[in-house]
Amino acid sequence: MSALCPLLTPPASEALLLAQARQLSGYTLGELAAMAGITTPKDLKRDKGWIGVLLEIWLGASAGSKPEQDFAALGVELKTIPVDSLGRPLETTFVCVAPLTGNSGVTWETSHVRHKLKRVLWVPVEGDRSIPLAERRVGSPLLWSPSEEEDRQLRLDWEELMDMIVLGQVERITARHGEVLQLRPKAANARALTEAIGARGEPILTLPRGFYLKKNFTQALLARHFLLQNP
């Protein structure tokens, strides 16, 4: 049996990607970091994206911070998702930055959100803060595409939120808007402002916004998958 090691090049097929992801299941983050020659931070306060970066290394992801999917040749996006002991998501899932200007003619079919969610490799990771970061285990992966109903739910929320952005109501949007998709500020500090449209159509400066999947949406898709896998 060959020793487990990170993929040095992007996987050539979904089957190879999923096979590698399945091999990581059951390992701790500390074990995977040590095998990849990476130091595990004490916590994620200063390294919020560390788990994602670690798994990108193991799975041969190519995109880095570019707007395309993590596995561009396969059209697959990687999403790590922290879960509790019952496999329920502990936080919302970032999808992409929301465009606050230049949105004339944009449709759900051509949107960045839909592009990012077209095909996703979900990798659950233990997220209970009582477990030291190095001891948190990686779970069983799921390769997912939205069903017709999921696509409909996402589209309705996206259209409502984009209508508000275009009509100059971005600052009235709260995390409560949307059934499965929400829009909320995404900035490392409150001084990082970006241009948007105000209530009277004038240019304004506001915090950058990001689209996030709500926990009810990711919980339902994970529950369906793992119930199917473990009847």
Curated annotation (Swiss-Prot):
GO MF annotations, alphabetized: DNA binding; endonuclease activity
Disulphide-bonded residues: none
GO-annotated biological processes: DNA modification; mismatch repair
Entry keywords, A to Z: Cytoplasm, DNA damage, DNA repair, Endonuclease, Hydrolase, Nuclease
UniProt GO cellular component terms: cytoplasm
Matching CDD domains: MutH-like (cd00583)
Record's keyword annotation contains Iron-sulfur: no
Highest taxon in the source lineage: Bacteria
Protein's cellular compartments: Cytoplasm
Annotated Pfam families: MutH (PF02976)
Gene3D superfamilies, A to Z: DNA mismatch repair MutH/Restriction endonuclease, type II
Similarity field: Belongs to the MutH family.
Function: Sequence-specific endonuclease that cleaves unmethylated GATC sequences. It is involved in DNA mismatch repair.
Matches recorded under NCBIfam families: mutH_TIGR (TIGR02248), PRK05070.1 (NF003458)
Protein name (record): DNA mismatch repair protein MutH
Organism: Salmonella typhimurium (strain LT2 / SGSC1412 / ATCC 700720)
Underlying gene: mutH
